[in-house]
């Protein structure tokens, strides 16, 4: 920004306000840096937690003690990161114009109709969805399975919040559209809460 001190017709800018007493949300980082941090944090957290997934705290302590870093030489994420990438790709392709048809088409194109591919892993809600899609059921019927309540949408909802930064209602709306193929009820609400929180 150019200085206005040399231009007589523009009044001098008022003194900067005192720094706030508490921390600034986002730490003064720009939107791109916060988005990158949110998505990298998701992936790193997933890789850190993956070896201990589904273990009881007592089992974790017995095996590793207190975990303060990676516990394997080759950390890798899970389907949580893969499906967050899936949601991010949907947003990159469709943005706020995202519809359930777009989501369902992507499930077929990138996951259900392939024997192998980048979205290899799947939680139980995704497996139920894949089974329904492969049987020819369309959204929202594809989301009617025993695990539609699960956290699968919540695990992939961060990109919606990143995309709709500062607009939690829009982030929640997009998460509900994404989840309409795979989740229902509490499964949708959990994803909306994560997306809105990230936004």
Q: What annotation goes with each model-predicted range?
A:
Residues 1-199:
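Structured, active/binding-site neighborhoods that engage oxygen-rich ligands
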């Amino acid at each position: 920004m150019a200085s206005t001190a040399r231009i007589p017709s523009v009044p001098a800018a008022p003194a900067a306000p005192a720094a706030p007493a508490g921390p600034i949300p986002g730490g003064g980082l720009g939107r791109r840096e916060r988005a990158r941090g949110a998505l990298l944090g998701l992936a790193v957290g997933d890789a850190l937690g993956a070896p201990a997934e589904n273990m009881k705290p007592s089992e974790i302590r017995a095996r590793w003690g207190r975990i303060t870093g990676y516990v394997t030489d080759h950390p890798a994420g899970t389907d949580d990161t893969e499906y967050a990438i899936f949601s991010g790709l949907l947003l990159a392709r469709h943005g706020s114009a995202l519809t359930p048809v777009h989501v369902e088409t992507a499930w077929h194109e990138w996951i259900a109709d392939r024997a192998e591919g980048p979205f290899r892993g799947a939680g139980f809600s995704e497996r139920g969805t894949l089974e329904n899609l492969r049987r020819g059921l369309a959204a929202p019927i594809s989301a009617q399975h025993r695990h539609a309540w699960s956290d699968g949408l919540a695990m992939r909802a961060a990109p919606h919040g990143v995309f709709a930064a500062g607009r939690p209602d829009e982030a929640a709306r997009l998460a509900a559209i994404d989840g309409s193929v795979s989740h229902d009820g509490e499964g949708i609400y959990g994803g909306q809460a994560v997306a809105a929180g990230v936004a």
